[in-house]
């Protein structure tokens, strides 16, 4: 698949199935991520790979967060608790702000966003699908703290990863 076809044909599948990429495949994906534009070579992007038992740990964190929401319904609480199990692997996108006179915080976030796009395009080229999720679970200080992130670190989203599932449903853009 050439680069332009990869860009034009990538979409987010609604159905996420096993398997996840191998460790060797993920090393290539991370190399591609780090080729994203990075003003002043600050390296603001890092990635937490969640799979296997890690999905349960992330589920526990999401459920703990849900319990802090006043008057949360059981349905929404279960939705948060089950969110990590939608795919066999999740990459948590972390942006680390570093003080720099010429590189404001927004440019550092844009670098991490570009890294995320490189991740998704790399996975697509390897016949995997990726869905970038944000919402209340991203940009969330409670979850960041429970993941052990520092004050200058922020979650920019979660990339859910699975085998590229080919069906009419997979062709729908999410």
What are these regions (language model features)?
Residues 1-86:
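N-terminal amphipathic, basic helical "cap/leader" segment at the start of enzyme domains
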Residues 6, 90-92, 158-160:
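Conserved hydrophobic/aromatic beta-strand scaffold that supports enzyme active sites
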Residues 33, 91, 97-145:
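Small-aliphatic-rich amphipathic alpha-helix that forms the alpha element of a beta-alpha
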Residues 48-50, 91-94:
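Short, conserved beta-strand edge motifs with alternating hydrophobic and charged residues
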Residues 88-90, 129, 154-156:
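Structural motif
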Residues 149-164:
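A glycine-rich helix N-cap at a beta->alpha junction
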Residues 165-174:
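Single conserved hydrophobic/aromatic residue that forms the stacking wall/gate
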């Amino acid at each position: 698949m050439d680069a332009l076809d990869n860009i034009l044909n990538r979409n987010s599948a609604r159905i996420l199935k096993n398997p996840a990429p191998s460790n060797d495949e993920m090393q290539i994906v991370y190399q591609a991520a780090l080729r994203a534009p990075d003003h002043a070579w600050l390296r603001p992007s890092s990635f937490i790979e969640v799979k296997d038992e890690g999905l349960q740990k992330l589920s526990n964190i999401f459920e703990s967060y849900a319990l802090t929401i006043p008057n949360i319904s059981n349905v929404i609480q279960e939705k948060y608790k089950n969110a990590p199990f939608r795919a066999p692997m999740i990459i948590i996108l972390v942006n680390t702000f570093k003080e720099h006179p010429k590189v404001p915080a927004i440019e550092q976030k844009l670098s991490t966003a570009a890294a995320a796009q490189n991740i998704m395009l790399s996975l697509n080229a390897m016949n995997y699908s990726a869905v970038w999720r944000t919402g209340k679970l991203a940009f969330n200080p409670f979850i960041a703290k429970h993941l052990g992130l520092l004050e200058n670190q922020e979650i920019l989203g979660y990339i859910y990863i699975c085998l590229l599932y080919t069906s009419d449903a997979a062709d729908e853009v999410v």
